[in-house]
């Protein structure tokens, strides 16, 4: 006869934590390093670039000679030997810490994994530009020094002052990424981890509030829903004066570059003659101070425009995600739409200058970033992101369904040649996009479920976000700021 054993049921977790999940989010802060820290940041970034390129060369050579694939674990263990190498040890062993170099190899490994998964192209070399970045994976601390400024402690850099314009979410700082942009400004992104619950409120079958979003060159965003709300949203990224100054600086840079190249060609000819005579070669000319100054001013102007574009994208995407439970976008392949029209020697392109101007206008408006950020925020709020085929949206009448390119009278005027319906051309396209998304969604899948569609149908990113939570969803938990404990 078998002996019975007592069984104690597992203790149930608190109700408030039954649906708790770990989420991660990052906040970006402007940093104000000392002169010594400024030099170290450039050295850290340059060392990471060197290690990343060295790791890529090792992987490429192993594949070329038919050897086994070099893994991240193998390369990360070789960091110590590399730092002790006499050839590199004089500068690589001083800075940065080994963990920072290992993070550069982790980024390289992630790039190869994405390539093997068919998501991106083959990893390229990290070129020497004005961008410097590295990631500190541990021992990141914060301490408050004033109501608006905080200091962050990073390995190898010590305490560095940052503009603490918003508190971090969560109590655990997982890593810190330091970025130096070409204009010399430095930013620190703090990645934090927090607990949050999955959204539990159902997605209401309310298609009237669904918004169609049309992206354009003259008007960046045209949004229209079924409740009669219509918006034309635009912002100039460049002022006329900045465009003139940018053009003038780029011309000055090219003149100085051409003069230096011409002088170096003459020096190369002289060196050939000196080599025959057995004389020492002459040194080539480096960048002049005037050329470097022009490049710094160009970088400053472009950084200013880039921040304006990012601010515009964040504001518009936040409004769309907050005010509409469904947003419908066109499936625009921006990468291919902005490809060069130069063609090849056998098949040269046409209207190259006009196409280049259109490409600049599309990239200035940030079409891809707008859809990408809106989709992320919709998922964060527990809403739906729909993507529909793009052909014909600008020449289709939403009233009668007639398709005719003659209906597009001008850039801003749409008059249907069949029923006479009149509307702003961009708002008309937004209405067509909205109706197309509703029809395809109802015909293809249940809108509440998550579904990854193809080019023949809509893409529905589900109402149950699995990565992030955000304010406004009504499902996030109260997080403890990382600075409150330090204060």
Place the predicted regions along the sequence by residue:
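Positively charged, helix-rich recognition surfaces that bind polyanionic ligands
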Residues: 4, 17-20, 24-28, 39, ...
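Short linear motifs in intrinsically disordered
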Residues: 9, 132-147, 167-168, 210-213, ...
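A generic secondary-structure signal for well-formed alpha-helical elements
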Residues: 48, 52-59, 112-119, 219, ...
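Long, hydrophobic, amphipathic alpha-helical segments used as structural scaffolds
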Residues: 56-59, 63, 112, 116-123, ...
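Acidic carboxylate diad motif detector
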Residues: 72-181, 343, 360, 364
């Amino acid at each position: 006869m078998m002996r019975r054993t007592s069984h104690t049921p597992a203790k149930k977790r608190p109700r408030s934590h039954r649906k708790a999940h770990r989420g991660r989010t990052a906040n970006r802060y402007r940093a104000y390093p000392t002169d010594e820290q400024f030099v170290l940041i450039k050295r850290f970034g340059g060392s990471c670039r060197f290690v990343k390129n060295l790791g890529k060369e090792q992987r490429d050579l192993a594949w070329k000679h038919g050897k086994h694939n070099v893994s991240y674990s193998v390369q990360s263990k070789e960091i110590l030997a590399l730092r002790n190498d006499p050839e590199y040890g004089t500068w690589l062993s001083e800075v940065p810490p080994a963990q920072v170099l290992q993070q550069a190899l982790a980024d390289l490994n992630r790039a190869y994994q994405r390539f093997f998964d068919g998501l991106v192209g083959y990893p390229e070399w990290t070129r020497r530009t004005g961008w410097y970045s590295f990631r500190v994976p541990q021992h990141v601390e914060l301490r408050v020094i004033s109501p608006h400024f905080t200091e962050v402690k990073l390995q190898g850099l010590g305490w560095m002052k940052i503009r603490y314009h918003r508190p971090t979410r969560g109590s655990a700082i997982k890593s810190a990424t330091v970025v130096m942009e070409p204009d010399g400004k430095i930013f620190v992104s703090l990645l934090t981890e927090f607990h949050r619950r999955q959204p539990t409120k159902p997605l209401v079958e309310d298609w009237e509030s669904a918004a169609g979003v049309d992206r354009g060159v003259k008007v960046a965003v045209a949004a229209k829903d079924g409740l009669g709300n219509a918006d034309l949203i635009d912002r100039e990224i460049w002022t006329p004066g900045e465009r003139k100054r940018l053009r003038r600086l780029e011309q000055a840079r090219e003149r100085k570059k051409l003069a230096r190249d011409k002088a170096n060609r003459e020096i190369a000819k002289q060196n050939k003659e000196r080599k025959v005579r057995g004389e020492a070669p002459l040194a080539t000319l480096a960048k002049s101070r005037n050329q470097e100054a022009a490049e710094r001013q160009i970088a400053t102007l472009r950084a200013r425009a880039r921040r304006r574009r990012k601010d515009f994208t964040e504001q518009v995407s936040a409004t769309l995600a907050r005010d509409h439970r469904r947003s419908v976008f066109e499936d625009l392949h921006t990468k291919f739409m902005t490809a060069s029209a130069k063609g090849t020697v056998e098949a040269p392109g046409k209207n190259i200058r006009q196409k280049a101007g259109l490409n600049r206008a599309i990239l200035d408006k940030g079409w891809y970033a707008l859809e990408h950020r809106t989709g992320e925020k919709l998922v964060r709020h527990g809403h739906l992101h729909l993507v529909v085929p793009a052909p014909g949206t600008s020449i289709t009448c939403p009233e009668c369904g007639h398709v005719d390119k003659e209906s597009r009278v001008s850039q801003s005027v749409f008059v249907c040649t069949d029923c006479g319906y009149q509307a702003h051309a961009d708002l008309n396209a937004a209405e067509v996009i909205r109706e197309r998304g509703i029809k395809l969604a109802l015909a293809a899948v249940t809108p509440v479920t998550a579904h990854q569609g193809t080019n023949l149908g809509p893409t529905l990113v589900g109402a149950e976000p699995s990565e992030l939570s955000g304010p406004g969803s009504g499902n996030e938990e109260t997080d403890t700021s990382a600075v409150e404990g330090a204060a």
